[in-house]
């Protein structure tokens, strides 16, 4: 893949997506990017943010709390309620 062609957001791991998002935030905060490019990277940043949120939701759904009996023996699992 060419360096100037960004990867499809939907194929990125959480770690790669968050790393790219952090880079975009830094570039926008520096204020040295032309208007059109700023808009384009902002839009990519929004897509990356959505990707990260989706991956976090999926991970949260997979996290389970281990249940134990009175003596501390594992009896099973149940969905973790983080609310």
From Swiss-Prot:
Location in or out of the cell: Cytoplasm
One Pfam family named in its UniProt record: Exonuc_VII_S
EC nos: 3.1.11.6
Coiled-coil regions, chain positions: none
GO molecular function: exodeoxyribonuclease VII activity
Catalytic reactions on record: Exonucleolytic cleavage in either 5'- to 3'- or 3'- to 5'-direction to yield nucleoside 5'-phosphates
Keyword Hydrolase recorded: yes
Domain of life: Bacteria
Swiss-Prot/TrEMBL GO biological process terms: DNA catabolic process
Keywords: Cytoplasm, Exonuclease, Hydrolase, Nuclease
GO cellular component: cytosol; exodeoxyribonuclease VII complex
Class of the enzyme per the UniProt entry, highest EC level: hydrolase
Assembly information from the UniProt record: Heterooligomer composed of large and small subunits.
Protein purpose: Bidirectionally degrades single-stranded DNA into large acid-insoluble oligonucleotides, which are then degraded further into small acid-soluble oligonucleotides.
Family of this protein: Belongs to the XseB family.
Protein name per UniProt: Exodeoxyribonuclease 7 small subunit
Gene name as annotated: xseB
């Amino acid at each position: 893949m060419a360096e100037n062609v960004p990867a499809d957001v939907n194929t990125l791991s959480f770690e790669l997506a968050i790393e790219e998002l952090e880079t975009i935030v830094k570039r926008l905060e520096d204020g040295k990017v032309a208007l059109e490019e700023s808009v384009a990277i902002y839009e990519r940043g929004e897509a990356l943010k959505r990707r990260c949120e989706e991956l976090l939701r999926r991970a949260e759904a997979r996290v389970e709390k281990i249940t134990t009996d009175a003596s501390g023996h594992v009896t099973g699992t149940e969905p973790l309620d983080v609310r």
